């Protein structure tokens, strides 16, 4: 494993530097070597309350920033879903992800150095028909609501879903 260690501060106008610093006098290792900038062309960003972490998406990929480092989006947190993402909301450290197929609920409180678990996939096709419009879905105290081909869908933190307009509108 290679690490970049601090050797010296060099003035901006200095063209050369000869490294004669002994290993015992080297500074700390660079802690940002594995940092990654936010992925290009993210289509949306959601703030995860109380953890100072961000979540975003592009096509069918979910991206998470490091906790307390909104500038750092490590690849180790990247997740690929089966369908393209339309919208995302957050409540109680759960990401509600609607797609052009089935919705997902991602528990981001359990993210460690390798992955976030569990990712709950709702097996019923409930595509979001919000046409990628940011205000076509809403987070409420009861869960995440969005428009699907079956009516307004309410997703709860347990993974349960309900068509809340079913009694007023038939199929």
Where is each model-derived feature located?
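Carboxylate/His-rich catalytic cores and anion/metal-binding grooves
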Residues: 45-62, 66-67, 81-84, 91, ...
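Beta-sheet-dominated scaffold domains
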Residues: 82-171
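Glycine-rich, histidine-containing beta strand-loop boundary motifs that form or position
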Residues: 5-10, 21, 57-58, 66, ...
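Beta-propeller domains
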Residues: 57-77, 107, 111
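Disordered, low-complexity "stalk" and linker segments at domain junctions of extracellular
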Residues: 1-59, 72-76
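Ordered hydrophobic segments in well-structured contexts
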Residues: 1, 5-6, 61-63, 87, ...
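Beta-strand initiation motifs
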Residues: 2-3, 26-30, 69-73, 111-121, ...
């Amino acid at each position: 494993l290679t690490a970049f260690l601090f050797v010296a501060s060099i003035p901006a106008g200095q063209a050369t530097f000869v490294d004669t610093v002994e290993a015992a006098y080297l500074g700390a290792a660079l802690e940002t070597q594995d940092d990654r900038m936010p992925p290009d062309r993210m289509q949306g960003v959601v703030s995860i309350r109380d953890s100072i972490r961000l979540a975003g998406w592009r096509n069918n990929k979910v991206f998470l920033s490091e906790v307390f480092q909104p500038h750092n989006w490590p690849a180790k947190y990247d997740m690929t879903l089966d369908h393209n993402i339309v919208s995302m909301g957050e409540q109680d450290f759960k990401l509600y992800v609607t797609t052009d197929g089935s919705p997902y609920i991602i528990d981001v409180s359990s993210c460690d150095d390798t992955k976030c678990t569990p990712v709950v996939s709702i097996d019923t096709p409930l595509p979001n028909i919000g046409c990628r419009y940011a205000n076509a879905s809403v987070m409420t105290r009861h869960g995440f609501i969005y428009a699907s081909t079956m009516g307004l869908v309410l997703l709860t933190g347990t993974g349960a879903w309900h068509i809340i307009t079913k009694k007023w509108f038939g199929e």
